[in-house]
From Swiss-Prot:
The active site is at residues 20, 23, 73. One of its GO terms (cellular component) is cytosol. Keywords: Hydrolase. Its EC number is 3.5.1.135. This is N(4)-acetylcytidine amidohydrolase. Transmembrane segments: none annotated. GO terms for molecular function: hydrolase activity, acting on carbon-nitrogen (but not peptide) bonds, in linear amidines; N4-acetylcytidine amidohydrolase activity. It comes from Cronobacter sakazakii (strain ATCC BAA-894).
Amino acid sequence: MKNDITFYTRFQQDILAGTKTITIRDESEAHFMPGQRLRTGRYEDNGYFCTLEVLRVTPVTLAQLNEEHARQENMTLAELKKVIADIYPGINELYVIAFKKVEG
């Protein structure tokens, strides 16, 4: 079965532990809706590891990222900005997808 959303393996444990409660994505993944349940897998091998429920999707610019976003990502603000720049180079318009783990 196909996953609805994937995360790099390095984020799996934080998601399962509930310490990572948001993901920041570009416009191509901004279509998720609150209440939607997402089959969630690892980016590297597409292996399923849990089901997430979308709580909200909020637009944000790179400049608007703050300590609260970093806390919800379970990293420092400097780490968060570096990860975003590495994954989405040159992209300024992003979306915060807040979620909770419901299975897995």
